Amino acid sequence: MKLKYSNCFVIIGFFFTTFFLGSVFVVASYGVMNQNLLQSTTGGSLEVNITTSPEVIAPNKEVKFKINFLEPDTDKIQVHVDYDFQVLKNGEEVFSAAKQINQPLLHTAEGSVTIPFMFSSPGSYSIKIPVLGINFIPINPEYAEFKFVIN
C-alpha cells in the first residue's frame, strides 16, 4: 500500500514540476525580465540592481529601467556615480543615454536613476551599464551587463 501512494506522490510531483518549469520558460521567452536583477561590475567596485516597469517587456512599448548603484555586498546605495546606460542588440549599440545628451557620461548624485526606453523590434538585447567614476573619483572603466530576449 505504501508503494502505491509513493508512486502517486512522485507522479503528482512530476506534473507540478513540469507545469511550473514550463511556465517559467514560456514567461522568459516573452520578454519578462527578472524583477530584481543584481550584478557586480566587472571590477567589483559596485553592484548594480535593475528593475523594470512594466514587468513584461514588449516591442514598441515604453519600459522604465530603475537602476540602483549599491556598495558591494550591502544594500546601501552608492551616491555620486558616473555611468552610462547602453542598449545593445546582437552586440551592437542601439542606444546610449549619455550620447542622447551629447555627453561622455552621466552622473547620479542619489545613486538611483530611472531611464525610459522603447525597444523597436524583437531580438536579443543587452543592457550594459559602464561605470567610470565613484564619489567624483575616476576609476578604470567597469560595467555590469544584463542579457535578455524580446519577442
Question: Model-flagged regions — what are they?
Answer:
Residues 1-32, 67:
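Secretory targeting signatures
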